[in-house]
Amino acid sequence: MQCRDSGKKATIFEFKRSSASGFKNINYADPEEFANASNEYCNAFSILTEPLYFGGKFDDSKGFVRMNKPLLMKDFVDRKVMIDKAYSENFDCILLISDFLSTDQVRDLSGYAKALGLDVLVEFHEKDRFDMIKSMDGLIIGYNRRNLRTLKMEGEEEMINNLIDETDNPFILESGINGENIERINELKFDGYLIGEAVLKDKEFLREIKNLGVIGYDGSRSYN
C-alpha cells in the first residue's frame, strides 16, 4: 500500500452482516454477490468474523478468496489462537485495536502474525495510542473515526492528517466514509480507506470511489 506519493488512494471494502451501531446489511445476504459487485473497485476486502456484535462468521470469507485480493480478518484479536485461525482460514491480514490492547500486546501479537507471513493493521482512535504505535515497523496504521467505547462518530481526521508524516507506515482512514464526505476526505494525505456501510448500502458509491482514483491493483496478495 505504498501510495502516499502516487496521488492515488487504496481502498479496502468491508463485508459485514450487522454492526453494534445498528447497521443491518439488507442488500447483500450473499457475500459472494458483494464480492462480485465490488471487486473491480477495491484493492482488498475486510471480512467481519466477530459473531456476537456483527453476526460474522468465517464462512463469509470463502466468496472472496477467488477474487485473489488481500483479505483482512476483522475481529477483536487479543490472543495468538485467533491469529492462528486467521492464518488457517487463508486471511492475509489481521486487525489489532490498540485502544483495547497494551503496548506489549500489540508488539507481541503483531510480531507473531508477521512471523506467519500475515500483514497487521493496527488501528487507533485515541491520539495517545498513535504515539505508542507510530514507530513500530512493518505495520499498517489506521485511524478509526468511530469511538469504539461509545460507538459515536468522533472524526478528527483533519487533526490526524497532520500526524501522518510522523510515521513511515502506510496510514489509512476508517469508518463513516460516504458520499457526503469522500471528496473532502480525499484531499487529505491518508494512503487509503477502509469503507463498509456506504458500499453495502449504495451501489452508486462504488463507482464514485473509482472515479476519485483507486490505486491500480497488481494481483499480488499483499498490502505492501
Where are these regions (language model features)?
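Conserved N-terminal beta1-alpha1 strand-loop-helix module at the mouth
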Residues: M1-L71, D78-V81, L118-L139, L148-E156, ...
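Structural motif
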Residues: I12-E14, S46, L95, G142, ...
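Short secondary-structure boundary segments
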Residues: F15, T49, S98, R145, ...
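Aromatic/hydrophobic pocket-lining residues that form π-stacking "cages" and hydrophobic walls in ligand
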Residues: F64, V106-S110, L163
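Hydrophobic, well-ordered secondary-structure scaffolds
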Residues: P70-L101, V106-E126
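Catalytic cores of alpha/beta
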Residues: L71, D78-N90, E126-D137, D165-E166, ...
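Glycine-rich phosphate-binding active-site loops on the catalytic face of alpha/beta enzymes
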Residues: K85-Q105, G142-K152, L188-I209
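Glycine/small-residue-rich hydrophobic helix-like segments
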Residues: I140-G179
